[in-house]
Amino acid sequence: MQYKLTRIDPDASYEQYPIGERETVTDPSEGQVHRNIFMGKLEDVLSGAVNWGRKNSLWPYNFGLSCCYVEMTTAFTAPHDIARFGAEVIRASPRQADFMVIAGTCFIKMAPIIQRLYEQMLEPKWVISMGSCANSGGMYDIYSVVQGVDKFLPIDVYIPGCPPRPEAFLQGLMLLQESIGQERRPLSWVVGDQGIYRAEMPSQRELRREQRIQVTNLRSPDEV
């Protein structure tokens, strides 16, 4: 079986995967409001209801690459209880899942397989990059490791750490739910590529910059 790793080209045609399916467009609810106040408001309410259901019933795919996967599975245990966020039903097949966590080191030989699994997932679908290795290659600055899974997959949330704690994974999951709640998709019976409005999600590092600057006493690692 032959695999081919495809790099994202922003200048490529819309038919090329995954640019065509991940196109960012203007909010369709705004156009509806201008054309028809009642229908626009109704669609806005329906979009909120649909997004509420989507963000509170994520179906994760049971997939892991390295040590970060151990931290991710720890979030499913009783002390952390990921069931509070509606994402505890792990699926064994990507065709039954809409949410994937790339947890661990992504090697060149594994990248086409990850891309194939992503293509088999249900729409709409989301991806979290968990850990330094998945985000940027981590300490493996070598030819055999992909320096960031966003080179061949669209990523919704990045979780830093080596490895991140389960609490960090839960925070990333809540950020993903916040992003899903602000999405706007066409509500129609049409099946196919449809434009998606995604709100800009600012970096948590920039949001908490002032808070970090005001810190005067730094705690030791065993006190965190």
Curated annotation (Swiss-Prot):
Membrane-topology annotation of the record: Peripheral membrane protein
Chief localization: membrane
Binding sites annotated in the UniProt record for [4Fe-4S] cluster: 67-68, 133, 162
Any one Pfam family match given in the protein's UniProt record, by short name: Oxidored_q6
UniProt entry keywords in alphabetical sequence: 4Fe-4S, Cell inner membrane, Cell membrane, Iron, Iron-sulfur, Membrane, Metal-binding, NAD, Quinone, Translocase, Transport, Ubiquinone
Catalytic reactions of this protein: a quinone + NADH + 5 H(+)(in) = a quinol + NAD(+) + 4 H(+)(out)
Localization terms from the record: Cell inner membrane
Cofactors: [4Fe-4S] cluster
EC number(s) reported in the record: 7.1.1.-
CC cofactor note: Binds 1 [4Fe-4S] cluster.
This protein's GO CC annotations: plasma membrane; respiratory chain complex I
InterPro entries noted in UniProt: NADH_UbQ_OxRdtase-like_20kDa (IPR006137), NADH_UQ_OxRdtase_20Kd_su (IPR006138)
A GO molecular-function annotation: NADH:ubiquinone reductase (non-electrogenic) activity
First-level EC class: translocase
UniProt-listed GO biological process terms: aerobic respiration; electron transport coupled proton transport
Family from the record: Belongs to the complex I 20 kDa subunit family.
Oligomeric and partner information: NDH-1 is composed of 13 different subunits. Subunits NuoB, CD, E, F, and G constitute the peripheral sector of the complex.
Role this protein plays: NDH-1 shuttles electrons from NADH, via FMN and iron-sulfur (Fe-S) centers, to quinones in the respiratory chain. The immediate electron acceptor for the enzyme in this species is believed to be ubiquinone. Couples the redox reaction to proton translocation (for every two electrons transferred, four hydrogen ions are translocated across the cytoplasmic membrane), and thus conserves the redox energy in a proton gradient.
HAMAP family, alphabetized: NDH1_NuoB
Name by which UniProt lists this protein: NADH-quinone oxidoreductase subunit B
Organism: Azotobacter vinelandii (strain DJ / ATCC BAA-1303)
